[in-house]
Amino acid sequence: MRNFAIGLLLLTLGSVIVQPLIEIVNLGREKIILSTAVITSARSAKDRSLEYKSQRDLNAVVNEKLFAEYFSDAFMKSMNLSLVNADGINKYRFKPQDDKYNDIIVTLDFVEVGDGVSDQFVTTVKMRTETEYKYKTKAMKIVETMGNNASNNLVEEQTLILSIKN
């Protein structure tokens, strides 16, 4: 009977220790998925939104509206999302169709500067993606409901530098 009690205690302690570790692995996985979706969407939008007239002069001038449109379209398809609203061309709110994530907010900032050496223009796009992390394991969901209501945000920031080289 004593061995049975010790085995039960070890099993309980093992599950208490393992569940947060599983949640950390899930958090890393979600961060990788979000990062990959942002990078892929940005690459898709960059190629299609550069203005042709500026490309002839080796200037990387981006049509911001087209970039945002292509980016949001590719991001929606890659993460299985639907667009809730767009605040101008710089801020988008997406809602997941499969209830896998919480609402995702994407902010795009465009900066167009000269490169300082020649007369070329370089465009920098800063993308910030933010969502509240949704716990996957049952124990962590219970801890979240009993907790201090502190939100655990999952934030991904990427910078895309667009330049044209001769």
Per-region residue spans from a language model:
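Alpha-helical assembly-interface signal, strongest on the long, hydrophobic N-terminal helix that forms
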Residues: 1-69
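Short, conserved structural patches
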Residues: 48-166
